[in-house]
């Protein structure tokens, strides 16, 4: 019994030390949205998984021009609010805040994908370099795959309306078009291949959730035991490793870059990038899988948001269609043509402004203490993000931001000085869907052309609408992720003048 008072004293001392350390930590001087006291913050973290929209909106309204913090199950995230703060974050140097370290913390890449991809992200270099430079010659294959995919997955009959699952159909078409570039024929059409790459984001999410509730000291033990991603990586490797090795042999036989028999595609560029840093085939396999993880997940969501807006606002289909007919008759199905599709470009940008893939963006990890211009101190090791949804609905940046105005940005581009700033792929402190600054999404130029090709084909070939009352179904939120309805169907009817 004598030990009981000693135990009480020890608890009091430890509590006092904890509270003193907490008080001295500048993180806790930043206002919180949701409960912030020890243990109670976990209630806030759980609430965020279901009510992120409301919590982020509350924080943006209260703290615009400054910052607030949000509890996650395994950490606090500091969210910056407003264009001025967005610009401040993207200007911070890489030795102060890190994009790759933030990605590793968020996704736990070394456990959920592969350690070598975060250490040698060769796929990012390929997306930023040869993929972007070769968009024009790649487009013919992409368009061909889209045309075949649309015929297979939207099986219309005469002038009848047919009902097609929106998100699932767009995911199929995006996957085929992207992988026509990533892995080529016939693998891009292989059902087993599609099953593996479409399951992978869910496998990563399951592993990420388990690790988010795992104490830090146990992650090196629990992480390697997670079965889902490891199983998918094995399956993907079994399919792709022989193909990559065969491609390596082919490239050795055709060393001359001007040789017409030398493939010029994503796999070739990955192999060349891997050779430059002397990396094994396993890295190439994981880099291909990671490219699918990033490209297909985000592009499928973005194009589905745009499709749902076309179906919910059918009155805008004809103005876009008229522009498409005029441009394609003059330029053909080319990169130059896609650059002149201002109305379609604006429609896509407005869809992404109002219906992004995430309510936060420009995510970084502080490598050292960060002091903002307003004096707020963010300690080293903290994740920092900007409030993307708040930014995109800010009345200081957009007139009537809650109204879908599909030609908002094409109208802005009528001013010659604004033509580049308001393109779909352009980023700014007021538009952060692709991030902002030098770490903005490197694949957005490929994605822009791919999505324009898909939407152009749909608009030219079909009338589209929702059944019932015709209203767009509500989005589904998973934390800060914004997913278009996974159960909604879109009605398609073949147009009599289809086939341009």
Swiss-Prot record:
Signal peptide: none annotated. Pfam families: p450. The chain crosses the membrane at residues 1-21, 26-46. Its main location: membrane. It is a multi-pass membrane protein. Its EC number is 1.-.-.-. One of its GO terms (biological process) is secondary metabolic process. Glycans are attached at residue 374. It is an enzyme of class 1 (oxidoreductase). SUPFAM superfamilies: Cytochrome P450. It is found in: Membrane. Heme binds at residue 441. Its cofactor is heme. One of its GO terms (cellular component) is membrane. Cytochrome P450 monooxygenase that is able to use testosterone as a substrate for oxidation. Belongs to the cytochrome P450 family. This is Cytochrome P450 monooxygenase 103. The gene is CYP103.
């Amino acid at each position: 019994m004598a030990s009981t008072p000693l135990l009480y004293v020890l608890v009091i001392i430890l509590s006092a030390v904890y509270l003193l350390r907490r008080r001295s930590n500048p993180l806790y001087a930043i206002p919180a949205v949701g409960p912030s006291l020890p243990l109670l913050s976990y209630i806030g973290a759980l609430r965020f998984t279901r009510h992120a929209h409301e919590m982020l909106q509350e924080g943006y309204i209260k703290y615009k021009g400054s910052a607030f913090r949000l509890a996650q199950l395994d950490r606090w995230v500091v969210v910056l609010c407003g264009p001025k703060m967005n610009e401040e974050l993207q200007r911070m140097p890489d030795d102060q805040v890190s994009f790759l370290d933030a990605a590793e913390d968020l996704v736990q890449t070394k456990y959920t994908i592969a350690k070598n991809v975060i250490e040698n992200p060769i796929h990012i270099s390929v997306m930023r370099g040869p993929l972007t430079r070769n968009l024009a010659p790649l487009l013919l294959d992409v368009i061909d795959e889209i045309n075949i995919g649309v015929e297979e997955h939207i099986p219309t009959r005469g002038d009848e309306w047919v009902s097609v699952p929106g998100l699932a159909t767009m995911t199929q078409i995006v996957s085929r078009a992207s992988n026509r570039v990533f892995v080529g024929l016939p693998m891009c059409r292989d059902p087993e291949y599609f099953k593996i790459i479409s399951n992978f984001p869910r496998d990563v999410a399951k592993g990420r959730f388990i690790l988010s509730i795992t104490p830090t000291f146990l992650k090196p033990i629990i992480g390697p035991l997670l079965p889902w991603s490891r199983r998918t990586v094995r399956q993907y490797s079994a399919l792709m490793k022989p193909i990559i090795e065969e491609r390596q042999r082919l490239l050795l036989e055709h060393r001359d870059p001007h040789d017409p028999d030398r493939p010029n595609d994503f796999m070739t560029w990955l192999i060349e990038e891997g050779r430059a840093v002397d990396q094994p085939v396993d890295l190439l396999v994981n880099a291909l899988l990671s490219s699918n993880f990033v490209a297909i997940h985000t592009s499928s969501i973005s194009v589905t948001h745009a499709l749902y807006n076309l179906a919910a606002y059918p009155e805008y289909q004809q103005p876009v269609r008229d522009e498409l007919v005029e441009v394609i008759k003059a330029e053909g199905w080319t990169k130059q043509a896609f650059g002149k599709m201002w109305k379609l470009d604006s429609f896509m940008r407005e869809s992404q402004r109002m219906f992004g893939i995430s309510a936060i963006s420009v995510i970084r990890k502080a490598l050292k203490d960060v002091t903002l211009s307003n004096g707020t101190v963010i300690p080293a090791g903290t994740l920092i993000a900007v409030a993307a949804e708040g930014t995109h609905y800010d009345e200081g940046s957009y007139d009537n931001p809650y109204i879908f105005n599909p030609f908002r940005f094409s109208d802005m581009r009528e001013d010659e000085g604004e033509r580049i700033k308001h393109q779909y792929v352009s980023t700014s402190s007021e538009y952060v869907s692709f991030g902002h600054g030098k770490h903005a999404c490197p694949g957005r130029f490929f994605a822009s052309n791919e999505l324009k090709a898909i939407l152009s084909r749909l608009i030219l070939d079909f009338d589209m609408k929702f059944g019932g009352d015709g209203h767009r179904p509500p989005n589904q939120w998973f934390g800060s992720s914004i997913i278009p309805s996974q159960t909604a169907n879109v009605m398609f009817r073949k147009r009599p003048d289809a086939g341009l």
